[in-house]
């Protein structure tokens, strides 16, 4: 593809191969999520002027797209008509860092969403209403001891098929996997 201009990527931070053989890309510094064909034609994009630093994008089973708008500390779910159908701000509690730069989110099989909330030093799982149902790490307090994290970058539940790794047969998800930056 091109190396400069409107069709060039600027720090693509994630890429997901879709069932239709297209690729969904979080084009971080162009502030957009795009779906491209194998010959680099853009067939869908979300580039609302309100986006700032798109860190991650993932297509959901219902064809909506989960987007991490890191610069605005939010997780968005966008339908194919580019309507926001859900959003969650990771800087909305009193102890939150004002700019926590969430870096990754994945929709779990049970409908909840796991979020690596990088500078808030935590991984959270939220339900469909935005309620936190699980948290590991102390909000905005880095560390290396029990219940402490230092800039978690990625998180997913082992055995929960989120498009990253299919679970083994008859596996019950019981553990949370974390990786730091």
Regions found by a protein language model. Give the residues of each.
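Histidine-/acidic-rich catalytic cores in large beta-rich domains
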Residues: 1-181
């Amino acid at each position: 593809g091109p190396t400069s201009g409107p069709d060039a990527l600027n720090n693509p931070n994630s890429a997901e191969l879709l069932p239709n053989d297209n690729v969904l890309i979080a084009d971080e510094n162009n502030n957009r999520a795009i779906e491209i064909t194998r010959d680099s034609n853009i067939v869908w994009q979300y580039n609302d002027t309100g986006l700032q630093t798109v860190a991650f994008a993932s297509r959901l089973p219902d064809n909506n797209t989960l987007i991490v708008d890191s610069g605005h500390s939010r997780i968005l779910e966008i339908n194919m008509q580019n309507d926001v159908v859900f959003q969650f701000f990771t800087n909305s509690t009193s102890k939150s860092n004002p700019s926590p730069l969430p870096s990754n989110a994945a929709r779990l099989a049970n409908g909840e969403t796991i979020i690596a909330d990088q500078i808030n030093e935590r991984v959270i799982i939220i339900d469909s209403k935005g309620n936190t149902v699980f948290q590991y790490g102390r909000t905005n307090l880095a560390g290396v001891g029990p219940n402490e994290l230092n800039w978690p970058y990625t998180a997913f539940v082992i055995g929960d098929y989120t498009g990253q790794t299919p679970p083994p047969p008859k596996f019950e998800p019981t553990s949370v996997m974390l990786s730091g930056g």
